[in-house]
Amino acid sequence: MTVPVITIDGPSASGKGTVAAQVAARLAFHYLDSGSLYRLLALHARRRGIAWDDEPALARAAAALPVEFSDGAVWLEGNDASQDIRAEEIGIGASKVGALPAVRAALLQRQRDFCEAPGLVTDGRDMGSVVFPDATLKIFLTASAEERASRRHKQLIGKGESANLAQIMQDIIDRDARDAARPVAPLRQEPDAFLLDTTELTIDQAVDKVLEWFEEKQASGH
């Protein structure tokens, strides 16, 4: 039996991770936050003294990355790294290492290994285009740059961190440009992906829409 896969791709701070995690919970499917793999690699490299542009060393590290997802947390070398990988600096590093072809190739099979029964919901930049091209349902989830910057700003302030809205906005614009321009797996909406703009939607509304589309796909036998 083919394991159903829902891919949710989109730009930074679009809310795709929150939506994907809730869809997975509602369906009792496995969940893969692919972006966390790149964040973990950036963090691992920083701790190991590997530069974020050292492609051969990063590819070797990616192939042997000691990572585990369990109990709602992300573990690196046996330690909970869930908070460490969310630092803004590590997010920028993840975008840089993720632009390297050898790194993406090294992490490709590791991501596919998460596809197990009863199903998988995964989010990232190239889940529907590269990692799971035959996914049951592909979503391209986005929101305006202004809305994404506002959400990220509120998130950081809520954590008690200092945050500059203008700087966050610029970082998002820069990351969008980097993601769209990279030579391997550039961020783009696939022709067979449903577009979900969450600028004016709540999280619950976005989750409900994904579930509605999934039910339609299942009913049509695709």
From Swiss-Prot:
GO terms of molecular function: ATP binding; CMP kinase activity; dCMP kinase activity
Biological process annotations from GO: nucleobase-containing small molecule interconversion; pyrimidine nucleotide metabolic process
Binding of ATP, residues: G10, P11, S12, A13, S14, G15, K16, G17, T18
EC number(s) on record?
Answer: 2.7.4.25
Q: Please state where this protein is localized.
A: Cytoplasm
GO terms under cellular component? cytosol
Leading EC class: transferase
Looking at the Swiss-Prot or TrEMBL record, what is one Pfam family this protein matches? Cytidylate_kin
Q: Specify whether Ribosomal protein is a keyword of the entry.
A: no
Keywords (A to Z) from UniProt: ATP-binding, Cytoplasm, Kinase, Nucleotide-binding, Transferase
Q: Which reaction does it catalyse?
A: CMP + ATP = CDP + ADP; dCMP + ATP = dCDP + ADP
The text of the family note is: Belongs to the cytidylate kinase family. Type 1 subfamily.
Xref: NCBIfam families: cmk
- Name of the protein in question: Cytidylate kinase
- Organism of origin is Chromobacterium violaceum (strain ATCC 12472 / DSM 30191 / JCM 1249 / CCUG 213 / NBRC 12614 / NCIMB 9131 / NCTC 9757 / MK)
Q: Which gene encodes it?
A: cmk
